Structures are given as C-alpha cells and as structure tokens.
C-alpha cells in the first residue's frame, strides 16, 4: 500500500486511507457540491447541497484547501484542477465497480479486506493458503470472516465451494477499478503543487499517465527553480518547438533564441501582457518574426499557463497562481505520449484563439501589469 508525503500540507498520507476517507464520509458529497455549484460558491451553499452541517463542511473544506483540492478567495470557494480530476476519478471508480458506494467503503476501510481479495485467484484455495499468500498477521477467523462476506454479499465478490474460495468476475472488476483509483489518487497527491495551479478549463489531463512526470515548483525560498528548469530544457537537437508563454522573461526568451539561431522551426503564442512587454523591446525576437522558420502569435487576453512542446517526444506544462504576480509557479515535464497528446490539444485550442501580428496588428499602447519571473 502506498504512503506519500503531501507536497503542500507536509502530511504523511496513506493513499488507501485517503480513498476511504472520501467515499466513506461526507467528503465526497462536499467535493461534488464544490464542483457542481455555480462558481464561485460559499460554504453554506456547499453544506446545503451536500446535506451536511456547516461544521462538517468547514472541517472538510479546510482539509481540501490544505491539500490543494479547492481554492478560496475571501468567502468564495472553487475547485482546483486537482479537485476536478479527483472527483472524476472517484466517480469513474464508483461507476465501474459492481458494488454500491457503502459496500466499496467497507472494502476500503482496512487493508486486510483489500489484501485478501487481491490474493484470491480463479482456482479455489482454502483459507490457510489465502492467509499465507496474503502475508497478513490477521487470525484465520478474521480471514474467514472476510471471505464469507465476499461470498455472501449480494454482489458476490468471491465464490465458495467446500470451504475453498475463488475470485469472481465481480471481484476482479472491483479490484481493477480500485487500483485505477489508487494510481490516480497517488498522482493527484504527488502532483498537487501543479494541479493546484493548472487552469480549471485544462483539467482534462489523464492523471494516471503522470507517473513519469517530474514536478518543479518555485516558492519564496527558491523563486528561480522553475526558470532554471525551463532553461535546462532548451534543446538544440529538436527540429520543431512550439510554446505558449504567459509570463515575460527576457533571459528565457534569449536562451530559446539560440534554438532559432540553430535553425529549429518554431512557433510561439504569447498572451497579451507578455506580447506587449516583448513588443516594447525591438531587439526581442519573441514578437518580431526575424527568422523565416519562426512564427509569433498573440492572444488578446492574459493567461496563467505555459506550454513547451519539443518535437513530439517531450512536453513541459507550467502554471502559476492567479494571485502573486506569477511568482509561485509549478511545472511538469513528461515524455509520456498521452500527456504530450493532451498538451498538444491545449496548444491547438490556444492557437485557434491566437492572432498573427502580420495579418492582424495588435494595439500595444496599453499598460503592462509588471508580471515576470
């Protein structure tokens, strides 16, 4: 069973216990209310929708806040990308398992039940064999109690014949659904710093595919960590580079100019404020197409997302807090094909909104908001 240190709260979390805490309490109803209500919403509205007391809602919302599942601004509460994908992962599991929520809650309440079920096979085994393979310290009586529950429940997770037991189709389906939820929950915890900042409209990431992704996050003690990681990603060996940029940084821009000097085909989508700042510097390549193999584009709004696509083999996706002038940034770097495909989908959606400065020259007389790394 997986135990992880939460990067935001610093708590040591047993992931199986986290799953049970959600499905076995009002946490799930509160999480659903946060996601379903019109945004932003307030604590009392969430408590009413979840059918629970204000006190219980306050307690669970505080925990969600600490773990990056929701964000609050004054009295307003919204889910983060982490809160959205967590609810989706739990719902997917509950829809896939052949048992209702309360039975699933009982199954996940202790490690013993899950361990016993996962050590059943298609061949019949007696309780002693199951206990030995499961390597659990529980008594034979406890093992038999769980086996009897698996067999006698209305949902038939196991089949009994002559005091021997085997797993059923329903039991296998329950295990598969649980293991998928376990993987998703592990990644939601591990990538919490990034999911906390990822724009809600981009919370379509296949979280179970994030296992290979590394996370780099900046904070007050290490404000330049993400910038350093982005600089290290500058790769002269790629043949094509595409990016979305929402924070102006002349050092980063100059470093990536080297890729253009080496003939890398590139396209850059700058959000409005980044475009204005870069355009003020006539020596900055970012807004001026001084290379035949580079096309700058601009967006008419400000955004909080950055994407770098290095051919089709690596992607970096960074996001920052709406408050804090971009000083608190988290970025993932992944080579997983499904994460790359997801990021390409985001890039394409931004590209559809973008303008070509040669075809549609922007009005750049507006003021700059000072956001930078």
Summary of predicted features, one role per range:
Residues 25, 37-42, 120-126:
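Short capping segments at the starts of secondary-structure elements
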Residues 51-65, 136-152:
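Short amphipathic alpha-helical interaction segments
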Residues 75-93, 159-182:
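Basic, amphipathic "hinge/linker" alpha-helix immediately C-terminal to the N-terminal HTH DNA-binding motif
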Residues 92-121, 180-242:
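Amphipathic alpha-helical dimerization/coiled-coil segments
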Residues 309-310, 314-373:
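Amphipathic alpha-helical interface segments
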Residues 3-28, 89-116, 145:
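Short alpha-helical segments that sit at the start of domains
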Residues 232-285:
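Primarily the HKD phosphodiesterase
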């Amino acid at each position: 069973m997986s135990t992880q240190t939460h990067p935001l709260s610093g708590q040591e979390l047993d992931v199986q216990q986290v799953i049970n805490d959600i499905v076995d309490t009002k946490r799930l109803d509160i999480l659903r209310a946060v996601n379903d209500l019109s945004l932003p919403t307030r604590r009392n509205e969430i408590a009413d929708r979840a059918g629970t007391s204000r006190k219980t809602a306050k307690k669970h919302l505080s925990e969600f806040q600490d773990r990056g599942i929701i964000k609050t601004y004054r009295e307003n509460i919204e889910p983060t990308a982490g809160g959205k994908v967590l609810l989706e992962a739990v719902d997917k599991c509950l829809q896939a398992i052949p048992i209702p929520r309360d039975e699933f809650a009982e199954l996940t309440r202790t490690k013993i039940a899950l361990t016993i079920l996962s050590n059943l096979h298609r061949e019949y085994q007696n309780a002693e064999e199951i206990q030995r393979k499961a390597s659990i310290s529980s008594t034979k009586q406890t093992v038999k109690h769980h086996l009897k529950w698996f067999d006698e429940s209305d949902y038939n997770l196991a089949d009994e014949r002559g005091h021997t037991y085997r797993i059923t189709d329903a039991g296998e389906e329950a295990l598969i659904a649980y293991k998928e939820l376990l993987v998703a929950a592990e990644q939601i915890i591990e990538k919490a710093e990034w999911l906390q900042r990822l724009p809600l409209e981009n919370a379509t990431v296949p979280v179970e595919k994030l296992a290979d992704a590394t996370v780099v996050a900046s904070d007050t003690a290490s404000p330049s960590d993400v910038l350093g990681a982005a600089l290290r990603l500058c790769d002269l060996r790629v043949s094509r580079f595409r990016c979305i940029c929402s924070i102006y940084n002349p050092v980063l821009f100059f470093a990536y100019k080297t890729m253009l000097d080496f003939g890398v085909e590139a396209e850059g989508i700058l959000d409005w404020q980044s475009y204005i700042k870069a355009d003020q510097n006539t020596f900055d390549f970012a807004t001026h197409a001084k290379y035949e193999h580079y096309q700058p584009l601009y967006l008419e709004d400000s955004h909080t997302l950055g994407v770098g696509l290095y051919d089709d083999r690596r992607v970096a996706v960074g996001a920052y807090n709406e408050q804090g002038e971009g000083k608190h940034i988290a970025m993932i770097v992944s080579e997983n094909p499904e994460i790359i495909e997801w990021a390409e989908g985001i890039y394409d959606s931004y590209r559809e909104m973008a303008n070509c400065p040669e075809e549609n020259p922007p009005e750049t007389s507006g003021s700059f908001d000072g956001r930078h790394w």
